[in-house]
């Protein structure tokens, strides 16, 4: 006799070996989500405690960029330079942003676990497949490792073990890059990814909104944090190199700039070449790259200001080259952002996606609102010139026209006041001509015609005079 099937199964067959494996994988996935949530909460709480008990975290919250005790004379003569460090605000800000993003991804994983059960009759295997679309096992493992490595970095800095802390942070950065890339791709091809996401539109709309639009927004935020961490990663690599090799002060600046440029350019090419096929609209990486460029530039300027004489003595003009290189990195990031937005727009317009339709509707609504605002402003300006209620009407504008005709007994341009338009005097036939002559008689002189006063002129009568039709004056 077999054990009865669990409630909600599509058939009453006993559980097979495949169903048992699916249930085990489902519970393993749930445990991974729980551990990821705990690790994200722990790293966030550690940063909060470090901000409260600053005396217990001296190297983490102290002013790390103080180079006052450095012997500049030895450096000028060719001694080993002091490693370049970030200021406290940049270091702590980067760590806090990373912890907040990890916590947001943990919350997203919990929401994905809840929405994965889009049908009550869903078995463990299908629910596990839906949950993996939110976050696979490898992504959860990478997220756990990122959180714990960041906590170890903070604790090592608190105990002033600087070299080991920088090494652990480099490992944390590498794990964070893998975590963000795997979160974006889920470890599948882009065609498979799109088919799986689009297949949930009709089957599970709520879960589709989680693994579709919400995932795209979170991917942008996570990649922004990754590119923001490139500044700390470059400084950590530069510090490790300074501990193992003899660098001068200009060499320290140049090494940091080269490492940072390599990291940013490489990651931007990966975003444009691989990740853009999964999420078309990606603006977070480029914003993070520009912000990281500012962080590195600020650290270089602070280092150059404190060691001005050393840098200018050993390598004059090195800081100018560093500034130009950082400016080129920022310009490259902005250019890639423009390219990404252009390609995303062309893709959505070519395929007529819902995102493009919504953007077009938003643009039309914005234009309509702008037109309404302009018309209301124009109406308010016209209302200022309108007469107040109860005031006598003003003279119309056409009354000043010299060719205007007034009716109703008013004077026209000829001074007539008979109340009829002037064009009524134009006759159409002989009867109207005669009536017009009687109504408006003309006083003609009774004198002789003008031709009689011309001396010596006596016109001879003709049988058919030419001027017989001309009225005699």
Curated annotation (Swiss-Prot):
Q: Give TM segment ranges.
A: 33-53, 91-111, 138-158, 164-184, 217-237, 251-271, 281-301, 319-339
Q: Which residues lie on this side of the membrane: Virion surface?
A: 54-90, 159-163, 238-250, 302-318
Give the consequence of mutating residue 448 to E: In strain: Nonneuroinvasive mutant HF10
The answer to keyword Cell inner membrane applying to this record is: no
Q: What is the effect of changing residue 77 to C?
A: In strain: Nonneuroinvasive mutant HF10
Query: What is the source species?
Result: Human herpesvirus 1 (strain 17) (HHV-1)
Outcome (variant: residue 279 to M): In STRAIN: 17 syn+
Q: What is this protein called?
A: Envelope glycoprotein M
């Amino acid at each position: 006799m077999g054990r009865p099937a669990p409630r909600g199964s599509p058939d009453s067959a006993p559980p097979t070996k495949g169903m048992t494996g699916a249930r085990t994988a489902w519970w393993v996935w749930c445990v991974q989500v729980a551990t990821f949530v705990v690790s994200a909460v722990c790293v966030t709480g550690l940063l909060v405690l470090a901000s409260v008990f600053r005396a217990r975290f001296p190297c983490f919250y102290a002013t790390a960029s103080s180079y006052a005790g450095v012997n500049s004379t030895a450096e000028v003569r060719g001694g080993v330079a002091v490693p370049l460090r970030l200021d406290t605000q940049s270091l702590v800000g980067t760590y806090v942003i990373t912890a907040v993003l990890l916590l947001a991804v943990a919350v997203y994983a919990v929401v994905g676990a809840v929405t994965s059960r889009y049908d009550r009759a869903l078995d463990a295997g299908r629910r596990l497949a839906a949950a993996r679309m939110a976050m696979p096992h490898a992504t959860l493992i990478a997220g756990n490792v990122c959180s714990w490595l960041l906590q170890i970095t903070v604790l090592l800095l608190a105990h002033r073990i600087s070299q080991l802390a920088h090494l652990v942070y480099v490992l944390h950065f590498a794990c964070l890059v893998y975590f963000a890339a795997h979160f974006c791709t889920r470890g599948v091809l882009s065609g498979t990814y799109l088919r799986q996401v689009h297949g949930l539109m009709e089957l599970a709309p709520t879960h589709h909104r989680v693994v579709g639009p919400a995932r795209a927004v979170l991917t942008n935020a996570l990649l922004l944090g990754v590119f923001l961490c490139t500044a700390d990663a470059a400084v950590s690599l530069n510090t490790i190199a300074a501990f193992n090799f003899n660098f001068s002060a200009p060499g320290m600046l140049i090494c940091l700039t080269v490492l940072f440029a390599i990291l940013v350019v490489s990651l931007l090419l990966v975003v444009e070449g691989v990740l853009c096929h999964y999420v078309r609209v990606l603006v977070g990486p480029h914003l993070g790259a520009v912000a990281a460029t500012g962080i590195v530039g600020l650290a270089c300027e602070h280092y150059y200001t404190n060691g001005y004489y050393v840098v200018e003595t050993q390598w004059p003009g090195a800081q100018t080259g560093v500034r130009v290189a950082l400016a080129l990195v920022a310009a490259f990031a902005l250019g890639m952002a423009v390219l990404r937005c252009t390609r995303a727009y062309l893709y959505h317009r070519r395929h007529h996606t819902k995102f493009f339709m919504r953007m077009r509707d938003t643009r039309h609504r914005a234009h309509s609102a702008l037109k309404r605002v302009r018309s209301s402003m124009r109406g308010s300006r016209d209302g200022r010139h309108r007469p107040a209620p109860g005031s006598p009407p003003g003279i119309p504008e056409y009354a000043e026209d010299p060719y205007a005709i007034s009716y109703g007994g008013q004077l026209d341009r000829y001074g007539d006041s008979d109340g009829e338009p002037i064009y009524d005097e134009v006759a159409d036939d002989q009867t109207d001509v005669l009536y017009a002559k009687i109504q408006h008689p003309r006083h003609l002189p009774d004198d002789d015609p003008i031709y009689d006063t011309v001396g010596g002129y006596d016109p001879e009568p003709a049988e058919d005079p030419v001027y017989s039709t001309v009225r005699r004056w």
